[in-house]
From Swiss-Prot:
Xref: SUPFAM superfamilies: Ribosomal protein S16
Highest taxon listed in the record's lineage: Bacteria
Entry GO MF terms: structural constituent of ribosome
Pfam families: Ribosomal_S16 (PF00886)
Protein name: Small ribosomal subunit protein bS16
Coiled-coil intervals, chain numbering: none
Basic and acidic residues: bias regions: 99-113
Length: 124
C-alpha cells in the first residue's frame, strides 16, 4: 500500500481549510485516511503561528514507515525542519523568449554601431 502525506480539503466555498493526513495514494483527495497529522489554514496571515500546525512526532513516524509527502506538504515539512526539500533549478525557464533575445541582440548591435560611429567622428 503506497502511503502519501497530503492535504485533504475542508471548509466551505471560497474559505478553504486543509487537514494534513496520511492516506493510501489511491483513495480520493477528501476520502478515507489513516491519521490526521495537522492542519493548514491558508486564510490566516502568513506569519500566524496557527496557519500550519503539525504533529512532528507522528509525521516522522509515517516518513519512517515509507509515506511520501506531496510537494505542498514537503514545503511545510521543510519549513518545520522535518524533511529536506531538494532545490529546483531551471535556468532555462528564467531566460527571455526568442523574440526578446532577438530584440536585445539587435539593440546591442545598434549600440555598438553608434559607439563606433561616434568614435570615428571624434577621431576626425
Amino acid at each position: 500500500m503506497a502511503l502519501k502525506i497530503r492535504l485533504a480539503r475542508g471548509g466551505s466555498k471560497k474559505r478553504p481549510y486543509y487537514q494534513i493526513v496520511v492516506a493510501d495514494a489511491r483513495s480520493p483527495r477528501d476520502g478515507r485516511f489513516l491519521e490526521k497529522l495537522g492542519s493548514w489554514n491558508p486564510m490566516l496571515a502568513k506569519d500566524d503561528e496557527k496557519r500550519i500546525e503539525l504533529n512532528a512526532e507522528r509525521v516522522q513516524h509515517w516518513i519512517d514507515q515509507g509515506a511520501q509527502p506531496t510537494d505542498r506538504v514537503l514545503r511545510f515539512l521543510d519549513q518545520a525542519g522535518l524533511a529536506k526539500r531538494p532545490a529546483r533549478s531551471n535556468p532555462v525557464k528564467a531566460l527571455p523568449g526568442k523574440k526578446a533575445q532577438e530584440r536585445a541582440a539587435e539593440a546591442k548591435q545598434k549600440a555598438e554601431e553608434a559607439a563606433a560611429a561616434a568614435s570615428e567622428a571624434a577621431a576626425e
